[in-house]
């Protein structure tokens, strides 16, 4: 210890005076060891060091001996990284270690931009802090003090020195931007002595205004004192002085504010404001680290599925001031317009202000052109810096800057947030300007950006926040404004009268599809992200908010109850399908903004991607919409949806269901055949030259029966079928199932009622031959649902091929076709090699496969899923985002086993996961040939598939 202490004296700067050396020599060795764990602060507090030459104080701090035993971590791993103009110990590629803010500050410094000198404490240091009892280790504190000495040397000013005061800003900065972390602390290092020195140099009003801001910020952010506690004191003083604005307070007034603010610490915390600048810095750093585990931060990470981060970094920089008169100012800007993508600086600027003044809205900011006229040199440098940063980062940048007495300082840069329209234009323009290639441009647009372009959006979401009455699940994106209606029939009737309606139901059923189609938006009290309402609405591109448990739907009285509000039929509601918000009244809408840039951008995505993108479509209209959105075929056509297209069809289906004998059933099926054939012809025509995959009847038969109690159902079926009531009772009893989704459905229907499969196959082949004879290129693919054994599929394939031969013989025409199956039962995935002997293609039905693998009912999962997500038991809704570890492994296994038996096997997926970006990436990496999703998600899937390459 003695030799180490001697080293301090040997390494002291040449201007260390003899008096200082003597003072240090008197230090008690034992006392030094005792206090070393707190960074030498009790021996040479900065308040004492001010008596000596400031460089000596800084030098002593940096060389203070730390007791190794008190630090369980090793300083071999660098944890503090400094930066300043033209030099940096970090770079933009170190975001995981330095956080986004720290990495970008280091990068700006290294390329020669004017960045206030500073240091970044790494995310690994935060991790160590959390793991070691939330204490700053002696070794880390020593590194911080060494970094602080570098800042002091750069600036020629010193923390705690009244004659040359150095003030600091302290900010958090995780690798991913996370609102909910700690707010900024500015002007750290001020106390009664330092503020007097600052006042002598820069004027009393500036100094004491900075001091009162610091007391407020530090108290709120670091000490946990409510901002209102300070604000109350300020407001009372302004009233007493007869002024309204902070800027009207005199220096004398501000001194009074400072004293009152210091009293707040005593009143609220029972302790004095910590005047020691080192202590202030320690507490601020600890507050940033502690904020990583704050409830708000944890909740934010859970909601946004942010995992795998070590913690937050801490950025400490010397303060620069925009509030030092009319040659100073502060601003924020985007290097291009974030809303439109226009290549023009877009931002705001305030003369004689600090950064928080822009954000707080105390003063109205001015356009950047103001800066051009009043600070031409600084503005010119700013424009040059913007061009440098865009070309360096190859992106549109969000920049914060300050001008202090005509000198420009760059405070922060990051990739700028942008709208969908802005994102596409910026990506296209950057390619045209030669800054990025098309591969890079494709990755600059998020799939959610396309959602904005393909659905109507609210013009200004911030304008309606006070009218949000409930929040459900954002089941289908976009926005809808309409009058509420409580029945599907009424929705169709009102829509026929030219009214915009929102269908409100407890939950929807297949029988509601007419009203759902007529409605501009759908709101349900029950159901999840893959409920009937969500799936159907998503397929049509309609706005839907599902599972809104805050509302109570009273169909009888035709009212919607939310808390103490009663909303009646015909009242106006607005829905935000992207956020799940339910808003009272009308909110202005913006139509979808399709443009030439979007077409250009999507053509690049198509050139790059390997995975094909098809669509789920059940009608000719759906098929045409899918094709217009770039679909390369139909991956799923659900024949059961055609049965609900008219009253005649559904009544005929019910006759088929009620039939007791195969002869009776065949009569009803013969009546259905023309309907099915006509629909298939329309779809084949719309998809001329592209494959169409048609799934045979899948849902349980009870779904086609009327809703209501048994007496109502029997009464209605008696009228429709002419059967006696006791016969209908008997038939309904036989159809009744305890668990219909695992019961009499899928291929089990076709095996039990072969005539059903034969009718559907005949309709498909007759339609295909008819269209082919009219010059339409037809590629039908028939898909057998819910297969679990090769024998089930073999039975159905034999029936289908026999019907094909009969139709070809009857018409004298033939064509190529495929027969395959849906893999949606876990057993089918495990024996996929055997099933592939009968199947020419596999299509994974990930909705049912997820349901059966997890053992979750899609219709009931909403009761516990929110709890699972909030507790971190699940990271995401498995019906929305593919479970890659479980369901995904079954898909991989089935694909490998299937192709081992049939190398030419075509493999795809037709569940709702086909339009979810991270799931699409998995399917591409797993070697699937295609994904199929709703028509309105086709562009998103096209982009996601390209981003994988």
Swiss-Prot record:
What organism does the UniProt record list as the source?
Mesembryanthemum crystallinum (Common ice plant)
Just give the chief location class.
plastid
Q: Which GO terms describe its cellular component?
A: chloroplast
Q: Spell out the InterPro entries in the cross-references.
A: ATP_grasp_subdomain_1 (IPR013815), PEP-util_enz_mobile_dom (IPR008279), PEP_util_AS (IPR018274), PEP_util_C (IPR000121), PEP_util_CS (IPR023151), Phosphohistidine_dom_sf (IPR036637), PPDK_AMP/ATP-bd (IPR002192), Pyruvate_phosphate_dikinase (IPR010121)
Protein family according to the UniProt entry: Belongs to the PEP-utilizing enzyme family.
What modifications follow translation?
Phosphorylation of Thr-530 in the dark inactivates the enzyme. Dephosphorylation upon light stimulation reactivates the enzyme.
List the active-site residues.
532 (tele-phosphohistidine intermediate), 910 (proton donor)
Question: Encoded by which gene?
Answer: PPD
Q: What is this protein called?
A: Pyruvate, phosphate dikinase, chloroplastic
Q: What else is known?
A: The reaction takes place in three steps, mediated by a phosphocarrier histidine residue located on the surface of the central domain. The two first partial reactions are catalyzed at an active site located on the N-terminal domain, and the third partial reaction is catalyzed at an active site located on the C-terminal domain. For catalytic turnover, the central domain swivels from the concave surface of the N-terminal domain to that of the C-terminal domain.
- For the protein in the UniProt heading, the enzyme class is transferase
Transit peptide boundaries: 1-74
Q: How is its activity regulated?
A: Activated by light-induced dephosphorylation. Inhibited by dark-induced phosphorylation. Both reactions are catalyzed by PDRP1.
List ligand-binding residues for substrate: 638, 695, 824, 845-848
Q: What is known of its domains?
A: The N-terminal domain contains the ATP/Pi binding site, the central domain the pyrophosphate/phosphate carrier histidine, and the C-terminal domain the pyruvate binding site.
GO annotation, biological process? photosynthesis
Which EC number(s) are documented for this chain? 2.7.9.1
Q: What does this protein do?
A: Formation of phosphoenolpyruvate, which is the primary acceptor of CO(2) in C4 and some Crassulacean acid metabolism plants.
């Amino acid at each position: 210890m003695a030799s180490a202490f001697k080293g301090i004296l040997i390494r002291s700067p040449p201007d260390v005076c003899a008096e200082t050396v003597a003072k240090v020599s008197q230090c008690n060795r034992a006392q030094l060891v005792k206090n070393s764990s707190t960074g030498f602060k009790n021996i040479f507090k900065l308040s004492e060091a001010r008596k000596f030459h400031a460089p000596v104080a800084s030098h002593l701090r940096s060389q203070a001996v730390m007791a190794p035993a008190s630090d369980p971590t090793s300083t071999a791993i660098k944890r503090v990284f400094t930066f300043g103009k033209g030099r940096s110990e970090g770079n933009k590629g170190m975001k995981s270690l330095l956080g986004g803010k720290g990495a970008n500050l280091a990068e700006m410094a290294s390329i020669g931009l004017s960045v206030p000198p500073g240091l970044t404490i790494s995310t690994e240091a935060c991790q160590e802090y959390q793991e070691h009892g939330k204490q700053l280790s002696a070794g880390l504190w020593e590194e911080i003090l060494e970094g602080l000495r570098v800042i002091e040397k750069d600036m020629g000013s010193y923390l705690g020195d009244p004659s040359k005061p150095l003030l600091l800003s302290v900010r958090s900065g995780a690798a991913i931007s996370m609102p909910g972390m700690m707010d900024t602390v500015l002007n750290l290092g001020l106390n009664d002595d330092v503020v007097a020195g600052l006042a002598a140099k820069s004027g009393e009003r500036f100094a004491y205004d900075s001091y009162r801001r610091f007391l407020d910020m530090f108290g709120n952010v670091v000490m946990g004192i409510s901002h209102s506690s300070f604000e109350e004191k300020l407001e009372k003083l302004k009233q007493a002085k007869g002024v309204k604005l902070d800027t009207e307070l005199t220096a004398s007034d501000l001194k009074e504010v400072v004293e009152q603010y210091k009293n707040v610490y005593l009143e609220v915390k029972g302790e004095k404001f910590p005047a020691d600048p080192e202590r202030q810095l320690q507490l601020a750093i600890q507050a940033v680290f502690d904020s990583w585990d704050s409830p708000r931060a944890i909740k934010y990470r859970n909601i946004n599925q942010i995992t795998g981060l070590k913690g937050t970094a801490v950025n400490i920089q010397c303060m620069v001031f925009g509030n030092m008169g009319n040659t100073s100012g502060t601003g924020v800007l985007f290097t291009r317009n974030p809303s439109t993508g226009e290549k023009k600086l877009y931002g705001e600027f305030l003369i004689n202000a600090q950064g928080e003044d822009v954000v707080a809205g105390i003063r109205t900011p001015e356009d950047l052109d103001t800066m051009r006229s009043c600070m031409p040199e600084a503005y010119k440098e700013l424009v040059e810096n913007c061009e440098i940063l865009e070309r360096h980062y190859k992106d549109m940048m969000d920049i914060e800057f300050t001008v202090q007495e005509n000198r420009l300082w760059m405070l922060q840069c990051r990739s700028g947030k942008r709208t969908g329209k802005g994102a596409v234009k910026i990506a296209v323009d950057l390619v045209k300007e030669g800054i990025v290639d098309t591969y890079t441009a494709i990755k600059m647009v998020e799939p959610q950006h396309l959602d904005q372009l393909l659905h109507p959006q609210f013009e200004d979401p911030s304008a309606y926040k006070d009218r949000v009455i409930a929040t459900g699940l954002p089941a289908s994106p976009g926005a809808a404004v309409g009058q509420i209606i409580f029945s599907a029939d009424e929705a169709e009737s009102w829509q026929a009268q030219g009214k915009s309606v929102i269908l409100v139901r407890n939950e929807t059923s297949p029988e509601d599809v007419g009203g759902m189609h007529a409605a501009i938006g759908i709101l349900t009290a029950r159901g999840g992200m893959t409920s009937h309402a969500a799936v159907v609405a998503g397929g049509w591109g309609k706005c839907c908010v599902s599972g809104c448990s805050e509302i109570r739907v009273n169909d009888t009285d035709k009212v919607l109850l939310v808390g103490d509000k009663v909303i009646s039929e015909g009242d106006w509601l607005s829905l935000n399908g992207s956020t799940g918000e339910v808003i009272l009244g009308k909110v202005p809408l913006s139509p979808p903004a399709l443009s030439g840039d979007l077409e250009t951008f999507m053509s690049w995505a198509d050139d790059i991607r390997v995975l094909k993108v098809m669509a789920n479509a059940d009608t000719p209209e759906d098929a045409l919409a899918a094709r217009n959105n770039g679909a390369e075929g139909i991956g799923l056509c659900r024949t059961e949806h055609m049965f609900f297209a008219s009253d005649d069809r559904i009544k005929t289906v019910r006759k088929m269901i009620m039939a007791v004998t195969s002869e009776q059933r065949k009569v009803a099926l013969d009546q259905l055949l023309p309907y099915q054939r006509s629909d298939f012809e329309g779809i084949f025509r719309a998809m001329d030259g592209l494959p169409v995959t048609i799934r045979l009847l899948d849902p349980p038969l009870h779904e086609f029966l009327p809703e209501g109690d048994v007496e109502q159902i029997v009464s209605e079926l008696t009228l429709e079928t002419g059967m006696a009531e006791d016969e209908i009772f008997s038939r309904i009893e036989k159809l009744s199932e305890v668990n219909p989704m695992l019961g009499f459905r899928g291929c089990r229907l076709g095996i039990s009622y072969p005539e059903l499969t034969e009718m559907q196959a005949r309709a498909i082949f007759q339609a295909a031959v008819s269209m082919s004879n009219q010059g339409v290129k037809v590629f039908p693919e028939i898909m057998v649902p819910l297969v679990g054994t090769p024998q089930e599929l073999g039975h159905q394939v034999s029936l289908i091929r026999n019907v094909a031969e009969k139709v070809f013989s009857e018409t004298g025409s033939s064509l190529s076709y495929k027969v395959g199956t849906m893999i949606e039962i876990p057993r089918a995935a495990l024996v996929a090699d055997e099933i592939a002997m009968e199947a020419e293609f596999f299509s994974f039905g990930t909705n049912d496969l997820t349901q059966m693998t997890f053992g979750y009912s899609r219709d009931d999962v909403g009761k516990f899923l929110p709890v699972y997500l909030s507790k971190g038991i699940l990271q995401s809704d498995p019906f929305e985002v593919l479970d890659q570890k479980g369901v995904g492994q079954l898909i991989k296994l089935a694909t490998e086993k299937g192709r081992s038996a049939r190398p030419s096997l075509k493999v795809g997926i037709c569940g709702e996961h086909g339009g979810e970006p991270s799931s699409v990436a998995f399917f591409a990496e797993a070697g699937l040939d295609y994904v199929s999703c709703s028509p309105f998600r086709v562009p998103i899937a096209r982009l996601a598939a390209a981003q994988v390459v």
